[in-house]
Amino acid sequence: MTEPSEILVVTATYNEMETLPRLVEAIFGSLPAVDILVVDDNSPDGTGQWCEKYSQANARLRCLRRSGKLGIGSAIADGLRYAIDQGYRYVVTMDADFSHPPEKISDLLAAIQQSDGTPIDVVIGSRYVKGGNIQGWPWYRHLMSRGINTYSRWVLGLPVRDCSGNFRCYRASALASLNWE
């Protein structure tokens, strides 16, 4: 029997059959002791079926198959609630298309685990800091993303550069303190 992990990596999928098998292998290759939860929105390309089959051979992979295309926001929320309900200590969220490098998960975990007495509740793998990047986007998508993040920082008063990215690590106890209704 596999020892339970205290770390859950959550990724939302819709038609990610082309990338998900490689992503799962890359995550386990970097961090073999983590658990992975794939939240699939009933992908017609077989993503959910692949996940179910692979999870039978690897107890660290879990699948949450939803009835339809409900969207990435609710998929991530379902994954975060799953992590809380299952007693994980840390939750990493990332996209399934390799836009977030699996080998950087350990950097997010190291950052959230460091503490000078004050716990860190969330770490953002920002695209807009030194060392961060975005590859494969057309210029207008870069411009839109920069605009949305600048506007969000200004309106919400957030001291972060990347409000819209999905590469994050959360302390599950902090998530558990939120009202999920």
Kindly give the residue locations of the regions a language model identified.
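A conserved acidic beta->alpha catalytic loop
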Residues: 40-49, 98
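Hydrophobic, well-structured modules enriched for small/aliphatic residues and gly/pro motifs
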Residues: 94, 98-101
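Short beta-strand/loop segment that forms part of the nucleotide-sugar
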Residues: 24, 33-43, 64-65, 94
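Short loop->beta transition adjacent to catalytic acidic/histidine clusters or analogous donor-positioning motifs
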Residues: 5-7, 28-38, 46, 60-61
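N-proximal low-complexity "stem/linker" segments adjacent to membrane-targeting elements
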Residues: 1-26
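Acidic helix N-cap motif at the loop->helix transition within catalytic regions
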Residues: 18-22, 45-54
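Hydrophobic/aromatic residues located in beta-strands of well-ordered beta-sheets
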Residues: 9, 36, 63, 91, ...
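Acceptor/aglycone-binding surface of glycosyltransferases and processive sugar-polymer synthases
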Residues: 66-85, 90, 102-181
